[in-house]
A protein has these predicted regions:
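Contiguous, well-folded functional domains in the mature portion of proteins
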Residues: 1-238
Length: 238
């Protein structure tokens, strides 16, 4: 469209150069969209016992965490804590924390206070210039998916994805059980600009390591949680 507009600008007498300016803007927008929706192939590592990043981008942080609460069931609504940003929490974690049965409330673990129920969380921020197609961190089967909107708004609050607090933006949580029976949690999180999470799979889908399972449009982030007694984070620059 941008090229067509520029051709029109050359063939006709431009009005205050508005046609030329419009053509340049359209050309730039087309280039941005083509860059954003690119989906190049990736060389997926084949080493056993590792998890690969579910997203292209920059690692915001890697933190060891422990669950201190979970989303309440209907029977537990009378015994829950309310947070104005994050919503209602039952003040006990899941009986099997690392089963990731529902969304849990996590807190950082201090050095010296580690336990076998801890997990590592690695947060990957995707800028508008990064590839926004997300991939499975390991081969396995999706055993749970959960969509949550931001607290207090229809889909918001849409905090910038590079902020830690953005973990409570609109999000889709996917639990993958690997071939060895280990469960990991991948959470696609919308950002201030990216407001559309597009899952391409569902519960029961079997994925290969590195297989595409969804995307988030424009700027956003993906969090990966994995058992800390099995994995440890290693950041390797591309």
């Amino acid at each position: 469209m941008g090229i067509s507009t520029l051709m029109v600008a050359v063939l006709v007498n431009p009005v205050m150069h508005l046609v030329t300016v419009a053509g340049i803007i359209c050309l730039m927008l087309s280039a941005f969209l083509a860059n954003f929706f690119r989906d190049p192939d990736r060389v997926i590592p084949k080493e056993a016992g590792i998890l690969v990043s579910p997203a292209d981008g920059h690692v915001m942080f890697a933190v060891r965490e422990r669950a201190t609460g979970r989303r309440p069931s209907k029977e537990e609504q009378s015994n829950c804590e309310n947070h104005p940003l994050t919503g209602d929490w039952h003040p006990e974690a899941c009986e099997e924390t690392l089963s990731f049965q529902t969304e849990q409330r996590w807190v950082p673990v201090e050095v010296g206070g580690e336990s076998d129920d801890d997990c590592w969380r690695v947060a990957v921020f995707m800028s508008p210039l990064d590839v926004h197609v997300n991939r499975a961190c390991e081969a396995g089967t999706i055993v749970a998916m959960e969509h949550r909107t931001g607290k207090g708004k229809r889909r918001g609050p849409f905090l910038p994805a590079f902020k830690k607090e953005s973990e409570f933006n609109e999000r889709v949580r996917t639990v993958l059980e690997t071939e060895s029976g280990i469960r990991v949690e991948m959470t696609q999180i919308s950002g201030a600009v990216a407001r559309t999470i597009v899952p391409w799979t569902g519960v029961g889908t079997t994925l290969r390591r590195g297989e595409r399972y969804g995307m988030i449009r424009v700027g956003s982030r993906v969090d990966l949680r994995a058992p800390a007694n099995i994995f440890k984070p290693v950041v390797i620059g591309a």
